[in-house]
Amino acid sequence: MIVIKDAHFLTSSNNLSQCPASLTSEMVILGRSNVGKSTFINTLLGKNLAKSSATPGKTRLANFFSTTWEDKENALTTTFNVIDLPGFGYAKVSKSLKKEWEGFLWELLSVRVSIKLFIHLIDARHLDLEIDKNAKENIQALLRPDQAYLSLFTKFDKLNKNEQHRLFLNAPKPFLINTIHFNALSSKYPTLEIVRQTLLKYLLTNPL
């Protein structure tokens, strides 16, 4: 069983000089505006740390959280940072501001050696959006041998049973389906525990 022993806010940053020192492995969580990043982070960590914005595209900071995970089965306790990046793909953000943040976003992803896992949240109802395809291509182009990319589908509970089954069978791997808030869980779909185990496995594969 994976238990989140501690989770707290570290800092917010809009440039590399404001980012905390790279002292521990980190996972990046990114996705389109309103894909459910804040909800996912808060549920994953068991604490209301990430704030949801009522206005898509409003969040313009990279938020850093320190987390301590305990794997009770293997008697292992380890600390990771979670980085919540600004949502992308919202058309009403001014072009100059959007360009500025995309520059910081990709600069952060390309130079920060402590990043070990990219978690790309994708709305399960909209699997073929060009912005998500481009984001995936950009991330995978940046990947070092000690890094991993993982798709995680949100809004799974908005699909009917046939759509859920089809997504589970056909989604490109590696992927997870966020069923944390799904009431009628089937044993074949991930639970919160399986999501945590999977992320911990990725992070421990290539420690800092």
UniProtKB/Swiss-Prot annotation:
Annotated EngB-type G domain residues: 23-205
Keywords assigned by UniProt, alphabetized: Cell cycle, Cell division, GTP-binding, Magnesium, Metal-binding, Nucleotide-binding, Septation
Question: How is this protein annotated for GO cellular component?
Answer: cytosol
What does the record give as cofactor?
Mg(2+)
Which residues of this UniProt protein bind Mg(2+)? S38, T59
- Indicate which residues the UniProt annotation says bind GTP: 31-38, 57-61, 84-87, 154-157, 182-184
Q: Please provide, alphabetically and separated by semicolons, the GO molecular function terms listed in this UniProt record.
A: GTP binding; metal ion binding
The protein's matches in Pfam families, at most eight in alphabetical order, are given as: MMR_HSR1
Q: Between which residues do disulfide bridges form?
A: none
List, alphabetically, the SUPFAM superfamilies matched. Answer: P-loop containing nucleoside triphosphate hydrolases
Alphabetized PROSITE patterns for the sequence: G_ENGB
Q: Does the keyword Iron apply?
A: no
Gene Ontology biological process: division septum assembly
Q: Which family does it belong to?
A: Belongs to the TRAFAC class TrmE-Era-EngA-EngB-Septin-like GTPase superfamily. EngB GTPase family.
The entry's function note states: Necessary for normal cell division and for the maintenance of normal septation.
Q: What is this protein called?
A: Probable GTP-binding protein EngB
Gene (name only):
engB
